[in-house]
């Protein structure tokens, strides 16, 4: 499951970035009351949240991948990256649609598609609720990972074999 969760975290992180980029572009072009909507405080807040979520999601999944490349078990870290990034993607997609207003539902802009696509990541490879429980169990000492039945070699070992 770790590999799938890692992939979901990476995809969700990309979705946060796409929502951020589309929202920044729209906020600098769309005008209301004589100013771009990016000048409005709550639009700024939503865009700032997207940036924060993107940076945190990116660091979590990169750390998870780094651990895997070192040959270390990364179930805890991958679960956290998947949980955080998918929740962030759902929030970013909702905010992106909000920033775009009625245009958020239009096929002219990609954010409506982002909003539809984000939900899958929240559900598959373990729902957000399952990942919350897993993280709590790690902290409370109720969960300890067993040795994997089989594992891919560390990436550095793959490079040495070439």
Predicted regions located by residue number:
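Alpha-helical interface subdomain recognition
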Residues: 1-162
């Amino acid at each position: 499951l770790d590999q799938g969760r890692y992939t979901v975290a990476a995809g969700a992180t990309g979705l946060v970035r796409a929502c951020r980029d589309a929202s920044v572009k729209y906020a600098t072009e769309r005008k209301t009351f004589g100013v771009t909507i990016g000048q409005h405080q709550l639009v700024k807040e939503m865009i700032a949240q997207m940036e924060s979520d993107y940076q945190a999601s990116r660091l979590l999944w990169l750390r998870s991948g780094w651990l895997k490349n070192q040959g270390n078990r990364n179930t805890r870290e991958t679960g956290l990256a998947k949980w955080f990034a998918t929740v962030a993607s759902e929030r970013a997609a909702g905010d992106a649609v909000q920033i775009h207003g009625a245009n958020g539902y239009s096929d002219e802009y990609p954010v409506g598609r982002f909003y539809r696509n984000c939900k899958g990541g929240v559900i598959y490879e373990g729902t957000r609720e399952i990942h919350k429980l897993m993280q709590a169990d790690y902290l409370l000492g109720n969960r300890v990972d067993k040795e994997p039945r089989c594992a891919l070699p560390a990436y550095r070992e793959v490079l040495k074999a070439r």
